[in-house]
Every structure is written in C-alpha cells, then in structure tokens.
C-alpha cells in the first residue's frame, strides 16, 4: 500500500535486523513521499530518501526506476550511481541494483515484482527455481481477510483511546526521565533540544563580519549584528535581542563602559503565521519534515552571534531580550552554555 516503500527505507536505516531490502518506487532525489504516513517533522532536513536508503549498505538493497519521480535515479548525481559508489567503496558493489523500467509509470506491477522476487530469492537463499512466475490464486473471502473476529475482538479506538494512549506515553516517559541520574538526565534534554533545533553550539565556528553583517561561513546564514557603542576593554558584553533601533531600553548605551550589541535574527518582527508548503492537507510534516521552523532558524542565528562575540571578546555574555524573543534566547543560551552569564528577558505572553 501507499507508503510501504518509504517505510521500508526508514526501517532499513534504523533497524539492524533486516538482511535484505527492496524499497521499490521511492528511492529518489525528487519527490520523497506524498502521504502523511511517509512524513514527519525533522525527518528529512538536510537529507533525503537516497541518503537514508544508503544507510542500509553494505546489505543487499534493490530498487527500480520507473516513469515517475524515480526516472532520473540512473543519472549521475541523482541517486543510484552514488549508492553504487558507496557499495563499491565497501567492497559490495554487487549488493545493489536499480533496473531501468522507465517505460512504465509509477507501479509495483509484474516487471517490478519479478526483480524483487529474484532479489529476495538470491539473498534470502529461498531456493526457488528462476524465473519465478506468478500463478493465479484464489482470493480470500472477506471473512478470511478480517483481522478481528470472535477469537480476536476489535479493541477500542477513536479520540478517547488516543488521549489515553498519549497520557500513558507521557507518564511512561516522565517516569523514565525522573529515574535517570542528574547528569544523564541533563544530557538527554540537551540532545533532545539539539535535535529539535537541528544545531549544536559551535565555539570554533568561522565567520566574516563587515558593515554590521555577520556571516556564518559554514551555513551562509547572515545576521544583522550592530555595535551600539565602542567601549575600550569592556568589563562585560551585552547582546540586545528583539529590540528595534531607537527603543527606550537602548537609550544611553552609547556612553556605557560595557560593550553592547544589537542583533536581528531570521524573520524577526514578521507578523502572521510562518510559511508552509502548499498542500490542501494541513500537516506539519509536509513543511517541517524538510525545513527548519522559524523558531529553530532564529536560534541558529543566536548561536552564531554568541559564538562570534565569545570568540572576539573572550568574555561572558549578558543577554537582554524582549518578550517575543524570550524563548529563543533561553534555548540558545541553554545550548551555548558557558559563554552566557545572565539572561534579562521581558515577560512574554506565556510567562
């Protein structure tokens, strides 16, 4: 059914137990899966089905190319040649195939299944005589097809059960976290935030800075970073976030003996909801499965600013924030750790 190819890719990437894989019709550098069952927030940021499939190497990985989004898989730079190179590098070039079946539309018809039968027969040592030819068979009745019957009655379902299950999951996870030693618990939370934000703090990141623009040379992210004053050998470095130039909080800072900077991060001050992928079905995974959220990108910018100021001044930083930027500042400071001495944040709508 729909999503089977994608789920085969993900299973092969995560679970060491499968010994052979054939994610037909979904290994592509183009469309990555149109169903909600094939997508999840954070799943493919900076990656895609080709790279996820390659995580199965060097175990046997088969697929086909059809007249759909997989049609370019055989083109250098588009997927399969790169997978083949990886397998060759691991000494198992023969363990991956992608026959050209581009004279057929998206399908799992007999020509595709015949490739799959042979692939599984060989690598699972099934011993069937080849070619494996399909034969007619009698369809099961509706009663025989049924999953639930008198011996196996259908369990409860619906929104009420969903609430019970999510409550149970929350209680289970809270109990697990609370059972951890403090340092281990701290590491779990840090890794969770690094995953959600999609970035670690890099104290040795490289930057260029010119005309009040800070550029992260690795990511090419560009941030407005403007010195408010030019204090010589300041005792502390203060970073102001979320404030517009001319704000009353900035008045008089030009004469301060401490160092003060004003930063503006990604889409700061933009009103309205963040842009989403055009799709009639509202589903976060369609947008955030491939793109960082606005919140995450703002934290990325803050991490860059913190790293840069820490490098050039070698002093702890004091962060001043509006209510709108409070959460982003707290997360960035948490991930950065030592460079941040103090946060002075105005109240937000949530605090």
Regions found by a protein language model. Give the residues of each.
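Short, flexible loop segments at the rims of nucleotide/cofactor-binding pockets, characterized by
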Residues: 38-43, 241-244, 295
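Alpha/beta-hydrolase-fold serine-hydrolase catalytic core, especially in secreted/extracellular enzymes
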Residues: 57, 64-238, 245-261, 268-316, ...
